Amino acid sequence: MSMQDPLADMLTRIRNAQMAEKSVVSMPSSTLKVAVAKVLKDEGYIAGYEVNGEAKPQLSIELKYFEGRPVIEEVKRVSRPGLRQYKSVDDLPKVRGGLGVSIVSTNKGVMTDRAARAAGVGGEVLCTVF
């Protein structure tokens, strides 16, 4: 079976692993997944990540918990292959009044909505995390 939306698969694996209280989740690696994992790490939603293997690289994400509860309460895919969501810098969404983040793919790389506003660029809204 071919994977139609690898990023949605990544987010689902993270969500399922946190519900099962796993400490680490692994998945096939890609450039986009590593960029999203870097943003999640920089924002403090995951403890860490690493890419293992040469021929078929695997991305391992170390999940983060606070007082026994997952740090990521909600993660949603916004732009999907069947309906891409592109937003200008003025239209970038705020998640829960600025408490969460939107992860945006811009021509300057994958970044949070706050960083995109600061850089003055819009792009494809990949997902929201709270």
From Swiss-Prot:
| Pfam families tied to this protein | Ribosomal_S8
Q: Which InterPro entries match?
A: Ribosomal_uS8, Ribosomal_uS8_CS, Ribosomal_uS8_sf
GO cellular component annotations, sorted alphabetically?
ribonucleoprotein complex; ribosome
Residue ranges crossing the lipid bilayer per the database entry: none
To which protein family does this belong? Answer: Belongs to the universal ribosomal protein uS8 family.
Q: Please describe the quaternary structure of this protein.
A: Part of the 30S ribosomal subunit. Contacts proteins S5 and S12.
Matching PANTHER family: 40S RIBOSOMAL PROTEIN S15A
Q: What does this protein do?
A: One of the primary rRNA binding proteins, it binds directly to 16S rRNA central domain where it helps coordinate assembly of the platform of the 30S subunit.
User: What is this protein's record name?
Assistant: Small ribosomal subunit protein uS8
Origin organism is: Ectopseudomonas mendocina (strain ymp) (Pseudomonas mendocina)
**Which gene does this sequence derive from?**
rpsH
